[in-house]
């Protein structure tokens, strides 16, 4: 930190007193100088400029010594200055090890570094810096004008040489260039720049709108193409399902015919009843196993179809996310289209699942009906056999009854096993479907949650950008107001000059018109469409007879 004025004066007086008390030395050079700051500033040991000792207060030191059990008078030394007599404590070893000695400069540096400026203080400092800079620029400009006026008077009163003529010509060129740059700062030319910039912005905006429309058409065409692909895939899936149902119906019809033929065969061949029953059981087991295998294959096919649809939906979502990332600044409707498309896909998938569930239930009902018919036929056949056996065989052998009982017991056990196996299959299917539905629901919620987080993130970014644009607009308005105030003050200051400035204003207008025409020519030279150039010419109020075609 820099030293205070009092400290510098005190250091200087102390240094002079010490120099008078010291013996004189032989002078080597009268003009030699020594930078005393290299050896450190010499200052009296006042209370404010002395090294800062934490816990240096006498009362605090006494309390500390009392707490440590060392309550005795410390060793001191007397320091006599011109204005006071001070008694300094000779520092000893710190028992606590927590004391710290630092210089005032270091303490002030740490205190200054620990201070955090607020936003208002930063703005105030920036405003003060701008005002100071503007004042310096005004002072320098005024000084330059005075020096130029004096130089012009001096040059007009003397004859110029060839080199001076060349220098004068260069100076005039520089002055002309400076006047041109100054004219660039005029309000009319600023408005002209704004008009040209506005024309360029309109041209760029129209091009962007056209590009946006083309992109929207491409997106619509792509969406229609995807819808057509999904419709074709759906029709193919429906055809495959219809073909599969047709084959299953034919197979069930063949099974029914086989059962009817088997029943007729049983009626014709009563002597082989036991063997035929065993064959029927084996055929029924094979048929049930075949149905189970068909159910498993059907479940696997539905699972594969579902995985394909999910992969297709994921691919479409990834494609939409990529397009959304590329057109984030221009296309906000893309996200809504993706969400609607995803909802439609989910609705179609739900309809497909409902249709598959309905088909499965109808198939189970058909199987249950066939089993009921078979059991009914078997029961009826058993009753007929029993009546016929009762009529034809009055004397029944116990061994035959025992065998019949064993056969009936085996039949019941087999049917019980079949029912148990069927129930286990039904429970397994229901569990598998429930797990798959839960997974689909979790995946849908995850995608929906990610989309909501992305929408919230975009909304926050948009709000941040809007805040930045608002601050920038406020800053521009403030600068415009300051410029307007400066222009008003300049006009008030130049109003008293009267007629002399009238001709200058006329010349200034002519120069401004020339500069406007040149800028308009430069605008046309850039290749901007003629309608924007004509609109810029109309806003700039350039007369038609003087405009450049």
From Swiss-Prot:
GO terms for molecular function: AMP binding. One of its GO terms (biological process) is establishment of left/right asymmetry. Residues 1-27, 391-416 are annotated as: Disordered. Pfam families: TPH. Expressed in trachea multiciliated cells. Its main location: cytoplasm. Keywords: Cell projection, Cilium, Coiled coil, Cytoplasm, Cytoskeleton, Flagellum. It is found in: Cytoplasm, Cytoskeleton, Cilium axoneme; Cytoplasm, Cytoskeleton, Flagellum axoneme; Cell projection, Cilium; Cell projection, Cilium, Flagellum. It comes from the Eukaryota. Residues 119-232, 259-393 form a coiled coil. Microtubule inner protein (MIP) part of the dynein-decorated doublet microtubules (DMTs) in cilia axoneme, which is required for motile cilia beating. It is an AMP-binding protein that may facilitate dynein ATPase-dependent ciliary and flagellar beating via adenine nucleotide homeostasis. May function as a donor of AMP to AK8 and hence promote ADP production. Microtubule inner protein component of sperm flagellar doublet microtubules. Interacts with AK8; dimerization with AK8 may create a cavity at the interface of the dimer that can accommodate AMP. Interacts with CFAP52. Interacts with ENKUR. Directly interacts with DNALI1. Interacts with DNAH11. Interacts with DNAI1. PANTHER family: CILIA- AND FLAGELLA-ASSOCIATED PROTEIN 45 (PTHR15504:SF0), NASOPHARYNGEAL EPITHELIUM SPECIFIC PROTEIN 1 (PTHR15504). Belongs to the CFAP45 family. This is Cilia- and flagella-associated protein 45. It comes from Bos taurus.
């Amino acid at each position: 930190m820099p030293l205070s004025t009092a400290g510098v004066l005190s250091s200087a007086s102390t240094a002079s007193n010490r120099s008078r008390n010291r013996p004189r030395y032989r002078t080597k050079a009268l003009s030699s100088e020594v930078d005393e700051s290299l050896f450190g500033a010499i200052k009296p040991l006042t209370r404010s400029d002395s090294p800062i000792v934490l816990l240096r207060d006498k009362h605090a030191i006494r309390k500390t010594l009392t707490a440590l059990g060392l309550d005795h008078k410390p060793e001191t030394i007397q320091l006599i200055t011109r204005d006071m007599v001070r008694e300094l404590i000779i520092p000893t070893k710190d028992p606590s090890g927590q004391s710290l000695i630092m210089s005032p400069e270091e303490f002030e540096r740490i205190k200054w570094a620990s201070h955090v400026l607020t936003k208002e203080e930063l703005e105030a400092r920036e405003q003060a810096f701008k005002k100071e800079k503007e004042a310096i620029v005004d002072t320098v400009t005024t000084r330059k004008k005075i020096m130029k006026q004096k130089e012009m008077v001096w040059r007009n009163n003397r004859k110029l040489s060839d080199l001076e003529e060349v220098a004068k010509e260069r100076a005039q060129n520089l002055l002309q260039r400076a006047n041109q740059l100054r004219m660039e700062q005029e309000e009319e030319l600023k408005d002209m720049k704004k008009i040209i910039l506005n024309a360029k912005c309109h041209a760029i905006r129209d091009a962007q709108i056209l590009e946006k429309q083309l992109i929207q058409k491409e997106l619509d065409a792509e969406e229609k193409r995807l819808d057509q692909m999904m419709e074709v895939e759906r029709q193919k899936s429906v055809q495959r399902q219809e073909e599969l149902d047709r084959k299953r119906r034919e197979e069930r019809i063949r099974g029914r015919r086989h059962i009817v033929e088997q029943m007729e065969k049983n009626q014709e061949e009563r002597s082989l009843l036991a063997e035929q029953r065993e064959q029927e059981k084996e055929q029924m087991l094979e048929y049930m196993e075949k149905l189970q295998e068909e159910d498993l294959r059907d479940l696997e096919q539905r699972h594969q179809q579902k995985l394909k649809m999910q992969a297709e939906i994921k691919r479409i979502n990834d494609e939409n996310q990529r397009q959304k990332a590329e057109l984030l600044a221009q296309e906000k409707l893309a996200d809504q289209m993706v969400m609607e498309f995803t909802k439609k896909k989910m609705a179609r998938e739900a309809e497909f699942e409902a249709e598959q569930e309905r088909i499965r239930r109808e198939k189970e009902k058909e199987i249950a009906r066939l089993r009921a018919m078979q059991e009914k036929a078997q029961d009826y056949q058993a009753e007929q056999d029993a009546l016929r056996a009762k009529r034809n065989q009055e004397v029944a052998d116990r061994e035959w009854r025992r065998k019949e009982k064993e056969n009936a017991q085996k039949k019941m056990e087999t049917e019980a096993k079949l029912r148990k196996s069927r129930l286990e299959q039904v429970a397994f299917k229901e569990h598998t479907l429930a797990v798959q539905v839960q997974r689909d629901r979790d995946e849908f919620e995850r995608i929906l949650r990610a989309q909501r987080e992305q929408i919230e993130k975009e909304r926050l970014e948009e709000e941040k950008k809007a805040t930045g644009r608002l601050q920038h607009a406020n800053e521009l308005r403030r600068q415009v107001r300051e410029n307007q105030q400066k222009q008003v003050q300049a006009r008030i200051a130049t109003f008293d000059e009267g007629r002399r400035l009238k001709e200058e204003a006329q010349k200034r207008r002519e120069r401004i018109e020339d500069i406007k025409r040149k800028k308009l020519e430069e605008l046309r030279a850039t290749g901007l469409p003629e309608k924007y150039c004509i609109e810029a010419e109309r806003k700039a109020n350039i007369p038609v007879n003087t405009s450049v075609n």
